[in-house]
């Protein structure tokens, strides 16, 4: 996308003899003005990928890959029944991980002896690393297949400086990494690279496409198959623009001191200091039992160094007083993280809810869009309760 990636993607595709490859001529060369798009960020989706999709339609190609200008991220979309499906970073990670894990650890009769994909690796231990605001799918699939003793799943703070460091540490232990990723379309698919790389990721997904399409399937069909098997990992990640940055710390402090206990320096922080429930009922002393799905069962606050998920209440991830970040757990299948951006005047939130794979066949939802719509409504209700956007002049970036 008006950057450095096209030359290298074309080169590696030629080496792998992928002949059905065409690039958008108007966007193939570096252009610091990004003349053909309003925003070269591939996360924007349809608008940014429009020219590539139009070219694919003319050529009758079903898949589009797009790198951002510095080619460290990869976006992907697929034409399904005449419409383009834009995959999120979480969905792409699910597809790639499941394909690798199921190839390594499953047979037609179920879980079997691992079949190593990497001929040059003697490691018996594999790793998956992901940022703490990305999907929990790696944990889900490893628990489902009972391979946690062979595949270690680890969270890091946001940023590939943390993910890359973990990949290097694993390599020094003689262990392989299956994938390191962030929800924002950042992927590290090789032990030979210690940062997100859209070029090697593009090759990896192209090779996977070759395998999937050879089986007369599609990325979207495979994703649906995974969700029906392992559960629908629905996510809603958005942000509020902050007009007055001086309000950020008081807003986050209000959440962590919800009970107005006025902790002193020698006081012991506990789960009771935070909201007991999420949503518009968060301030109610006796929420209705029907809202138990929003009952907070755990909190991790990396700003003050608190994590109720451990007996000592100490987080295992690094803490920083300069980074505002709180995560709420409502059971094991509902997670919300709120954090202040370190580079922009934004308060970001990341919500994930895991639902059974039968939600469409049992009539719970009529469509995937309706399920996401309900999640969106839940997210906005929760944010209204915690952040009071109108009162605090927070502008929704969605």
How would you name each of these model-derived features?
Residues 20-23, 83-102, 200-204:
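Gly/Ser/Thr-rich active-site loops/lids in small-molecule metabolic enzymes
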Residues 1, 69-73, 183:
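Generic detector of well-ordered alpha-helical packing
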Residues 47-51, 92, 96, 162:
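Well-ordered alpha-helical segments embedded in enzymatic catalytic cores
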Residues 25-29, 90-93, 157-161:
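Short, acidic/turn-prone active-site loops that include or flank metal/cofactor-
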Residues 9-76, 168:
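N-terminal small/polar loop signature for handling phosphorylated ligands or for N-terminal nucleophile
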Residues 1-4, 133:
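Glycine-rich, mobile lid/loop segments that gate access to catalytic sites or pores
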Residues 9-13, 72-93, 138:
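Short Gly/Thr/Asp-enriched flexible loops that form oxyanion-binding sites at enzyme active sites
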Residues 57, 61-63, 67, 83-85, ...:
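Phosphate-binding and adjacent anionic-ligand microenvironments
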């Amino acid at each position: 996308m008006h950057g450095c990636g096209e030359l290298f993607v074309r080169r590696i595709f030629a080496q792998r003899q992928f002949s059905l490859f065409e690039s958008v001529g108007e966007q193939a060369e570096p252009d610091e003005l990004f003349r053909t798009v309003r925003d070269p960020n591939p996360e924007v989706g349809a608008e940014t990928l429009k020219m590539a999709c139009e070219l694919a339609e003319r050529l009758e190609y079903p898949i589009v890959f797009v790198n951002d200008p510095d080619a460290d991220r990869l976006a992907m979309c697929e034409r399904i029944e005449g419409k383009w499906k834009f995959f999120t970073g979480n969905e792409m990670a699910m597809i790639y991980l499941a394909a690798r894990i199921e190839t390594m650890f499953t047979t037609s009769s179920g879980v079997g002896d691992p079949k190593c994909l990497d001929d040059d690796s003697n490691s018996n231990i594999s790793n998956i690393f992901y940022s703490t605001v990305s999907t929990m799918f790696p944990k889900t699939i490893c628990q489902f297949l009972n391979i946690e003793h062979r595949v270690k799943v680890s969270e890091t703070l946001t940023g590939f400086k943390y993910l890359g460091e973990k990949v290097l540490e694993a390599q020094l232990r003689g262990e392989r990494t299956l994938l390191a990723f962030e929800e924002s379309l950042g992927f590290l698919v090789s032990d030979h690279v210690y940062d997100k790389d859209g070029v090697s990721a593009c090759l990896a997904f192209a090779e996977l496409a070759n395998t999937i399409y050879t089986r007369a399937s599609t990325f979207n069909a495979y994703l649906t198959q995974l969700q029906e098997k392992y559960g629908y990992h629905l996510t809603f990640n958005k942000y509020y623009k902050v007009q007055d940055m001086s309000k950020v710390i008081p807003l986050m402090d209000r959440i962590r001191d919800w009970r107005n206990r006025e902790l002193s320096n020698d006081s012991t922080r506990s789960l009771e200091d935070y909201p007991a429930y999420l949503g518009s009922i968060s301030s109610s002393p006796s929420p209705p039992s029907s809202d138990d799905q929003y009952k907070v069962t755990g909190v991790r606050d990396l700003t003050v160094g608190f994590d109720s998920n451990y007996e000592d209440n100490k987080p295992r991830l690094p803490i920083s007083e300069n980074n505002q970040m709180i995560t709420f757990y409502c059971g094991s299948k509902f997670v919300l993280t709120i954090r202040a951006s370190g580079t922009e005047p934004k308060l970001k939130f990341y919500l994930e809810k895991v639902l059974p794979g039968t939600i469409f066949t049992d009539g719970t939802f009529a469509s995937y869009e309706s399920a996401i719509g309900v999640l969106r409504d839940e997210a906005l209700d929760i944010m209204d309760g915690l952040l009071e956007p109108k009162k605090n002049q927070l502008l929704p970036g969605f």
